[in-house]
Amino acid sequence: MKPLIKICGINDFNVLQQLVSMDNINYLGFIFYEKSVRNVSPEFLEQVKEFEFKGKRPVCVYVNSDQDFIKETSSYFKDPILQFHGNETSDFCNSFDNEFWKVLRINNQINVDEVIRYEKASGILFENYKKDQPGGTGESFDWSLINSVKDLDIKIILSGGINCENVDNAIAVSYTHLTLPTTR
């Protein structure tokens, strides 16, 4: 089975046009977090408003944003997945009509109860924990920890620190979904 690939952090329209033409990419991620160097600008949003994604699914990434901001910015995309990267509760995530992914940052273990709390998520994205940084660390965690949740009925999405040297191992661990960054 071929893994599904998400490229995240797209904020350049020319890069977006190139990525859409690539066959092996399934999801395109757009960050709506002002502290990120890959934050989407209002100008970019205007460009993407009528853009044809050619079968690729947009993923709008948020960190503790309010509902109005999420509804407004995600409306620029057709049927986006919402990816929650902050301290959003399961009730908050479930309050949207969109499919969503919840990010859980992993330090030394996976809290199975926390995974179960987000049972309505269409995917759980596991990423390395780094103090005061909600994501985009570029570092991996001990992927063997994923074994503690493999028997749960969830879509496992692996993110952080995936590169040419470890991509085969990443595929073996997560089976189906990988998230890769754009270049900064």
Regions found by a protein language model. Give the residues of each.
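Conserved small/polar residues in nucleotide/adenosyl-binding loops
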Residues: 176-182
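Conserved N-terminal beta1-alpha1 strand-loop-helix module at the mouth
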Residues: 1-150, 154-158, 162-175
